[in-house]
From Swiss-Prot:
Reported function: Catalyzes the dehydration of methylthioribulose-1-phosphate (MTRu-1-P) into 2,3-diketo-5-methylthiopentyl-1-phosphate (DK-MTP-1-P).
Lineage, highest ranks first: Eukaryota, Fungi, Dikarya, Ascomycota, Pezizomycotina
GO BP term (any one): L-methionine salvage from methylthioadenosine
GO CC aspect terms: cytoplasm
Gene designation: MDE1
Keywords for this protein: Amino-acid biosynthesis, Cytoplasm, Lyase, Metal-binding, Methionine biosynthesis, Zinc
Region feature Disordered, mapped onto this chain: 1-27
Protein name: Methylthioribulose-1-phosphate dehydratase
Record keyword Acyltransferase present: no
Broad EC category: lyase
Domain of life (superkingdom): Eukaryota
Pathway(s) where this gene product acts: Amino-acid biosynthesis; L-methionine biosynthesis via salvage pathway; L-methionine from S-methyl-5-thio-alpha-D-ribose 1-phosphate: step 2/6
Co-factor binding comment: Binds 1 zinc ion per subunit.
Catalyzed reaction equations: 5-(methylsulfanyl)-D-ribulose 1-phosphate = 5-methylsulfanyl-2,3-dioxopentyl phosphate + H2O
Protein's cellular compartments: Cytoplasm
Length: 273
């Protein structure tokens, strides 16, 4: 699925000023091509209420090429021609967003402010896909944790991580970066929470700190904002995002019923041999 090799990053101009716009990087009849997958994913996420009002986004890495949804586009109307493309390796020499070089830029949009956060998932976790949603269940979970933190004055860690165990859907998550297998039913899923900032790109350092502190996580919640989820490939990132949204909704409804997220349940051992 590797697209035609692009020209070097040095030969490409920045932002929307490309003289050769390299449209061949986003035009393909292959439905699994990143430039086709991102609009399809975003249209699906829009129907779920995850990316309303142009919020949220997605990015896919194919070897060195990174494909990104643009800023300000209505996600259900996105087309392959709207996709940005950049070289991941080139970012090491131009980390400043204002100097970021794109191999391919759409004419009518601006780069997503999520770009440095997506790049963090690719560089720090070798992810193949990163998804950002404004799921209202994710936001509600962060608000519940915020309320818990305010009621536990003096405990600085309260409200900074979402934890849940003994729920079947937890099996949808891997054990962590570089580890084999998935979490089990009795394991505890932990998703760190970072505080929101006025500008999306300013979240990057806090996202990276959360990755360092919780090396096994595949997601980071942003308080009053949404969630970032990444995976080895599109399939894993998508299914973990779906599993997380299920768990967030379940967690909110459990709180309404007075049920705890963390329980001590004895394993049921089969006796039949």
């Amino acid at each position: 699925m590797c697209p035609t090799c692009p020209p070097s990053a040095a030969s490409a101009s920045s932002e929307n000023n490309n003289t050769d716009n390299n449209d061949h990087l986003v035009l393909s009849s292959d439905s699994s091509h990143p430039a086709n997958l991102i609009p399809a994913l975003c249209a699906k996420f829009w129907t779920l209420g995850w990316v309303t009002g142009t919020g949220g986004g997605a990015s896919i890495r194919d070897n060195d090429l990174v494909y990104l949804a643009p800023s300000g586009v209505q996600k259900e109307l996105m087309k392959p021609e709207d996709i940005y493309v950049l070289s991941l390796a080139a970012q090491a020499t131009s980390p400043n967003p204002k100097q970021r070089v794109y191999l391919r830029s759409p004419a009518n949009y601006k780069p997503s402010q999520c770009t440095p956060l997506f790049l963090a998932a690719f560089t720090k976790r070798n992810a193949g896909c990163c998804i950002h949603t404004h799921s209202h269940w994710a936001v509600l979970v962060t608000l519940l944790l915020e309320r818990e933190r305010s009621s536990k004055e003096g405990d600085e860690e309260k409200g900074k991580v979402f934890e849940i165990n003994n729920i079947e859907q937890i099996k949808g998550f891997g054990r962590g970066f570089g580890k084999s297998g998935n979490l089990g039913y009795h394991d505890t899923l932990r998703i760190p929470v970072i505080e929101n900032t006025a500008h999306e790109e300013d979240l990057t350092e806090f996202l990276e700190e959360a990755m360092d502190k919780y090396p096994d996580t595949y997601a980071v919640l942003v308080r009053r904002h949404g969630v970032y989820v990444w995976g080895e490939n599109v399939h894993k990132a998508k299914t973990m995002c779906e599993s997380l949204d299920y768990l967030f909704q379940l967690a909110v409804e459990m709180k309404q019923l007075g049920l705890p997220w963390i329980t001590d349940i004895e394993p049921t051992i089969p006796t039949r041999k």
